[in-house]
């Protein structure tokens, strides 16, 4: 059972980040999900939070040492993904964290 739970953690953290569920993201990372785990498109939880405008989730991921300099399969950083969707405050936060 624990093995299956561990296998499900990365997809769960991606879903939580995409939905802006900050406390769930933090709990999953503390349970052992790598903070920079990538989804099939190469996106991290930080990228998913950023592109969906979830500032509090992005701040928490940065505090958990998520790397804002990573790029997805298209070569885009979390800041660039946020910029594409007009999330200016997130762009500033992510650029300052680099």
Residue ranges and their predicted role:
Residues 24, 56-57, 89-90:
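Conserved ankyrin/ankyrin-like repeat signature
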Residues 26-34, 59-67, 95-98:
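Ankyrin repeat domain, specifically the short helix-to-loop turn at the C-terminus of the second helix
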């Amino acid at each position: 059972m624990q093995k299956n739970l561990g296998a499900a953690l990365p997809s769960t953290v991606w879903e939580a980040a995409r939905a802006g569920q900050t406390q769930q993201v933090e709990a999953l990372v503390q349970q052992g999900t790598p903070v920079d785990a990538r989804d099939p498109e190469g996106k991290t939880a930080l990228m998913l939070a950023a592109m969906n405008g979830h500032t509090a989730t992005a701040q928490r991921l940065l505090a958990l040492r998520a790397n804002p300099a990573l790029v997805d399969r298209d070569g885009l950083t979390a800041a660039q993904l946020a910029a594409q969707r007009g999330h200016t405050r997130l762009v500033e936060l992510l650029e300052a964290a680099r």
